[in-house]
């Protein structure tokens, strides 16, 4: 079951295929809303599922290619993954980049369809970051670090405590053309481990900005920095590092 080019599936059909193979749900970033079918609709769904099984649940073309069970595992309970939601205000996508020791996949949900592509081992963070638009304004602005309480105080009083808060306010006030919320995830015998705070990415008229949130005593620290796609991938890898710590 090898997809060097994206192959499309109805989200509900892929969810049924994965659950039937693994006993687990499709990954949360891809999973469609549960539906109840009458007997006729259920018969049609069962027929589509049987057709998918007939097409994909058989001998692989090469001993190096994954079987249906291998692909289904990465689509439901991957050992390593990063994923997220993307929006430009009109189009909303969600994506999962997942990998094992010998292959990986990228699955992108667009409405009721999910497109799946497989690949030999690659850096998952790079694969997911590549979902972001390639065409974006580049900024040379210096990174800025503030506390969430400082921003709330400035919003309440109209007075910024320092230049860092003023710069952060300017960045945050710029309407996003594209926004993304990205997570890192690992799974082991003790279950699924997701980063506590997502990496947020905003494409604006003044540049692409990455927002990292972390704990600072009983506060939230906000790190805002100009970012390229490569930088977003590096920051995603950092989410994994914090899970391992």
Regions found by a protein language model. Give the residues of each.
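Short, surface-exposed polybasic-aromatic patches that bind anionic ligands, especially phosphate groups
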Residues: 1-245
């Amino acid at each position: 079951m090898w997809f060097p080019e994206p192959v499309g599936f109805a989200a509900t059909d892929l969810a049924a295929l994965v659950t039937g193979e693994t006993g687990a749900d499709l990954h949360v970033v891809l999973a469609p809303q549960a539906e109840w079918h009458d007997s006729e609709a259920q018969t049609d769904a069962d027929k589509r599922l049987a057709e998918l099984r007939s097409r994909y649940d058989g001998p692989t073309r090469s001993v190096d290619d994954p079987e249906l069970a291998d692909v289904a595992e990465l689509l439901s309970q991957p050992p390593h993954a990063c994923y997220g939601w993307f929006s430009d205000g009109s189009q909303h996508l969600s994506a999962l980049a997942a990998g094992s020791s010998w292959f990986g996949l990228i699955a992108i949900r667009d409405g009721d369809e999910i497109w799946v592509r497989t690949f030999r081992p690659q850096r998952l963070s790079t694969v997911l970051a590549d979902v972001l638009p390639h065409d974006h304004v580049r900024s040379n602005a210096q990174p800025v670090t503030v506390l969430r309480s400082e921003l709330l105080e400035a919003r309440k009083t109209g007075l910024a405590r320092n230049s860092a808060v003023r710069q952060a306010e300017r960045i945050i006030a710029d309407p996003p053309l594209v926004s993304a919320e990205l997570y890192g995830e690992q799974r082991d015998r003790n279950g699924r481990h997701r980063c506590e705070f997502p990496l947020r990415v905003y494409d604006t008229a003044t540049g692409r900005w990455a927002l990292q949130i972390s704990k600072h005593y009983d506060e939230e620290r906000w790190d805002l920095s100009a970012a390229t796609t490569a930088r977003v991938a590096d920051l995603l890898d950092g989410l994994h590092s914090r899970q391992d710590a």
